[in-house]
């Protein structure tokens, strides 16, 4: 700073005046407040800028030089030497020394000013450090309080969910108990309706039950053999195929026997109805007998009263006759009455005797009637006792028949479970993709003609029942067969029951993938999501309810599970995070993010920067599904009022560990709702809808190319042709259990798309992707979710 303020000198030696300051012995005075001494006008104070008389301090005292501001410094720098000639070196030297002293005083003033600034800066810095420390302490305390509040809020939320779940469970238990009581009452009433005719078929049913027991024993033996072979399935695959064919024959026989039993049950139902009518007539007869018994009892009571009255009248008449006879004798002996009086008395006696004889006859008649009524009463009592005894016997027989029927039905159910288990085992050994077909019901606003009603039919043969579907188009029949076919009357519960075992595999450590395919408006979203309501929920909410319920039941065996969920959509070949914080109402604030699909050597798939949420109950997933549904891209077309315009992918990562055995499992459940294929001529899409339709059809076409390449066994499978196929690569070409739902429309206007969907499903069903592998070894997972 001093060198910048020093004026240029005409002499070269004055260029380094700033450096000569140290050699002159000029020492700065003590620090002081800025300009305080100068403004106060102190003369000899050490805080005042002064100049010594000479170089050694021997000269006369110089006047005090004070600087009050920048103007004084500039004035000093602008000062010129005058009054001396060029040859007067001594005078010029004195002027130069005086000028140097002024410069030294100026420099000293600047140094003191700078020292004051430094002191004030140090004070401000210490004050700022103290304020920052206090602010950090306060911020840490606030963060701690906020974390405690969040933890308390989360705890209260979990307690509320737990209480609500307990309340719903108790309410459901009560409703179940009421339904059970009502069902038991109805069964008791129906049991009372079975009487005499069941005894005719009792022997035949017992023979059939015995035959069913023998067949069940044979099935159990077969099951035992299959369980023994299960330990060496990989080594003896060909042998198991032979056993599977034998099991198929047994299953066919069981299906036939099941049909026979269903016919027997129908005949038993008819028999029950006839027995119910017979019981009603018996009850009517019994009530009539009881009414007649009561009437006879009343008549007997009346007859007894009349008999008692007649006996009293007879006794009174006899006493009167005796009295008159005694009087007559007395009259004859004592009074000597006239003959006329005697005749009148005789007439009276005869009348009395006639009355007595008539009353005697009436008494005999009443006694006979009383005996007949008593016999009838005894006969009615005997009949009632016999009827009650027969009723109790029939009740015992009916109970025995019901137990046998329930046992036979249980055997049929167990045989069907065995069939499903064997079928799943065969499919796992083959490594095929399983395919289920579901037919959507005709909509109410569509006029269904006879041609539309006859468009789709279902084979009734034992081999194809429940697995085949026939389609008529222009007089030509197209037949297809899949692992399961659901007609238009199948409920959401029926659909989920068939695939519940596959969902269970995710908890066992397998990778599971379920996706819905079909044209737009064929019911894919209804099958996967379903509308709100207990009976209408789709595969995704039902699967999550089963997983959480099963994981809770396994806690008693030492298992603990942690689950993470994520949801995304592929819209116009762009991945969108449906759970992103800034996404709502189909508007994505995080479109700047570039989501990348990555596969690792273990077959796990991750999507970078994707939102992953920890879930602890089905209620947590329900709220996430509601948020994702609001964010998903939907639109209106001519074929569908609410058409999904993107592929929806829900993924649940499951990590489980057993404290007792130390075993760890890691499973993944992928549930996918594909966008529907559509033809531009029918959908009438334009603008953005046209771009969406083209992107959807392109990705589905890429999926078809992948399926065809796998079916033909090509060395190269074009998984990278679309985001959808690249995301599904572990499911279509890895070691996962994969199930495809093909949804079709029964309308005649959609028959072309329906045939294409069914043909594509047949090719998918023929694809062999490898045997599923269970992941039981502990591995470090990325913090983001795996789609493997």
Swiss-Prot record:
Sequence segments annotated as region (Disordered): 1-63
Sites where the protein binds ATP: 518-525
Domain Kinesin motor: 432-767
Stretches of the chain forming a coiled coil according to its record: 121-430
Positions of transmembrane segments: none
Key word ATP-binding present: yes
Keywords, alphabetical: ATP-binding, Coiled coil, Microtubule, Motor protein, Nucleotide-binding
GO terms, molecular function: ATP binding; ATP hydrolysis activity; microtubule binding; microtubule motor activity
GO biological process, alphabetically ordered: microtubule-based movement; spindle assembly
CDD domains: KISc_C_terminal
Matching Pfam families: Kinesin
Domain of life: Eukaryota
Gene Ontology annotations for the cellular component aspect, listed alphabetically: cytoplasm; kinesin complex; microtubule
Family statement drawn from the similarity comment of this UniProt entry: Belongs to the TRAFAC class myosin-kinesin ATPase superfamily. Kinesin family. KIN-14 subfamily.
Protein's recorded name: Kinesin-like protein KIN-14H
Native source organism of the sequence: Oryza sativa subsp. japonica (Rice)
Organism placement in taxonomy: Eukaryota, Viridiplantae, Streptophyta, Embryophyta, Tracheophyta
């Amino acid at each position: 700073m001093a060198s910048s303020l020093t004026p240029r000198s005409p002499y070269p030696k004055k260029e380094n005046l700033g450096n000569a300051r140290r050699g002159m012995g000029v020492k700065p005075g003590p620090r002081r407040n800025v300009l305080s001494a100068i403004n106060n006008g102190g003369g000899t104070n050490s805080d005042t800028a002064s100049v010594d008389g000479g170089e050694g301090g021997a000269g006369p005292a110089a006047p005090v030089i004070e600087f009050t501001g920048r103007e004084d410094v500039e004035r000093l720098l602008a000062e010129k030497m005058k009054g001396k000639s060029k040859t007067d070196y001594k005078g010029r030297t004195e002027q130069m020394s005086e000028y140097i002293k002024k410069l030294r005083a100026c420099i000293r003033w600047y140094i003191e000013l700078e020292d004051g600034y430094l002191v004030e800066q140090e004070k401000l810095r210490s004050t700022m450090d103290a304020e920052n420390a206090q602010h950090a302490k306060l911020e840490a305390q606030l963060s701690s309080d906020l974390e405690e509040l969040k933890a308390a809020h989360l705890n209260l939320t979990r307690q509320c969910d737990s209480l609500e779940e307990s309340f719903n469970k108790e309410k459901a238990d009560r409703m179940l108990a009421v339904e059970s009581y009502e069902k038991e009452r109805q069964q008791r009433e129906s049991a009372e309706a079975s009487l005499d005719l069941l005894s005719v078929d009792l022997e035949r049913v017992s023979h059939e039950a015995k035959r069913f027991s023998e067949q069940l024993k044979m099935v159990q033996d077969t099951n035992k053999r299959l369980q023994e072979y299960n330990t060496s399935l990989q080594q003896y695959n060909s042998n198991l195929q032979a056993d599977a064919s034998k099991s198929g024959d047994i299953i066919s026989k069981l299906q036939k026997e099941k049909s026979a039993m269903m016919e027997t049950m129908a005949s038993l139902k008819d028999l029950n109805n006839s027995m119910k009518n017979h019981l009603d007539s018996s009850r009517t007869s019994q009530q009539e007998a009881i009414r007649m018994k009561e009437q006879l009892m009343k008549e007997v009571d009346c007859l007894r009263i009349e008999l008692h009255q007649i006996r009293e009248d007879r006794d009174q008449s006899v006493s009167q006759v005796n009295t008159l006879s005694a009087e007559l004798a007395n009259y004859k002996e004592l009074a000597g009455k006239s003959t006329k009086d005697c005749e009148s008395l005789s007439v009276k006696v005869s009348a009395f005797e006639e009355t007595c004889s008539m009353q005697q006859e009436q008494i005999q008649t009443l006694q006979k009637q009383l005996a007949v009524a008593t016999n009838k009463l005894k006969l009615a009592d005997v009949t009632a006792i016999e009827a009650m005894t027969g009723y109790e016997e029939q009740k015992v027989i009916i109970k025995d028949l019901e137990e046998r029927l329930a046992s036979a039905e249980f055997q049929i159910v167990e045989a069907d479970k065995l069939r499903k288990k064997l079928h799943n085992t065969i499919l796992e050994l083959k490594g095929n993709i399983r395919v289920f077909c579901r037919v959507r019901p005709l909509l109410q606003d569509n006029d269904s003609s006879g041609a539309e009603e006859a468009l789709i039919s279902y084979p009734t043969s034992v081999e194809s029942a429940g697995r085949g579907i026939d389609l008529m188009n222009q007089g030509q029949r197209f037949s297809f067969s899949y692992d399961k076919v659901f007609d238009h009357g199948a409920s959401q519960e029926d659909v989920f029951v068939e695939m519940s075992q596959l969902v269970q595999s995710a908890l066992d450590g397998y990778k599971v993938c379920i996706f819905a395919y079909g044209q737009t408006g064929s019911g894919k979203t209804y099958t996967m999501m379903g509308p709100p309501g207990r009976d209408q929920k789709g595969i995704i909410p039902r699967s999550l309810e089963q997983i959480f319920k099963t994981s809770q039941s396994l806690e008693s065996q030492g298992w603990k599970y942690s689950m993470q969920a994520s949801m995304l959509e592929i819209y116009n070949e762009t991945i969108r995070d449906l759970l992103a914080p800034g996404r709502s109402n189909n508007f994505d604030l995080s479109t700047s993010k570039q989501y990348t699909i990555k596969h690792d050597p273990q077959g796990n798939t991750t999507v970078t920067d994707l939102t992953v949420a920890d879930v602890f109950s089905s209620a947590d997933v329900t709220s996430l599904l509601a948020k994702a549904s609001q964010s998903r891209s939907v639109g209106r077309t001519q074929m569908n009022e609410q058409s999904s315009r993107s592929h929806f992918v829900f993924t649940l990562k499951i990590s489980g560990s057993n404290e007792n055995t130390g075993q760890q499992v890691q499973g993944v459940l992928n549930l996918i709702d594909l966008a529907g294929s559509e033809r531009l001529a029918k959908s009438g899409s334009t603008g953005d809808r046209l771009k969406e339709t083209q992107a959807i059809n392109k990705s589905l076409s890429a999926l078809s190319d992948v399926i065809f390449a796998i079916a033909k066994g090509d060395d190269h499978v074009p998984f990278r042709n679309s985001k959808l196929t690249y995301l599904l690569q572990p499911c279509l070409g890895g070691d996962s259990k994969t199930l495809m739902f093909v949804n079709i429309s029964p309308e005649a206007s959609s028959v072309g798309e329906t045939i294409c969907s069914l043909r594509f499903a047949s090719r998918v069903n023929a694809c062999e992707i490898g045997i599923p592998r269970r992941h039981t070894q502990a591995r470090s997972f990325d913090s983001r979710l795996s789609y493997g």
